[in-house]
């Protein structure tokens, strides 16, 4: 599908650590989370989802939850960078 092909475009962006794609359906918003290094499965599990360490999915139901997911991902990324300074 189109949303999956967009993930592959995002993966080609060098220096990006986490990619998040929101796909809106009638009653829900599906979230695709991908990462090169930062584990994203714990983010997905907080939002009705799961998957693999670096490729996960979740479901949110409104813009407030979308914003909360983005804030959660930002915090995860900040923590990852501070715990792994040699990578940056």
PLM ranges: what are they?
Residues 1-88:
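Gly/His-enriched, cation/cofactor- and phosphate-binding structural elements
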């Amino acid at each position: 599908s189109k949303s999956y092909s967009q993930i592959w475009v995002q993966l080609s962006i060098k220096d990006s650590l986490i990619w998040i794609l929101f796909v809106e359906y009638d009653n829900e918003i599906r979230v695709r989370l991908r990462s090169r290094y930062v584990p994203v499965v714990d983010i997905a599990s907080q939002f009705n989802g799961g998957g693999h360490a670096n490729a996960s999915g979740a479901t949110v139901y409104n813009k407030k939850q979308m914003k909360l997911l983005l804030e959660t991902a930002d915090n995860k990324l900040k923590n990852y960078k501070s715990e792994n300074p040699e990578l940056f």
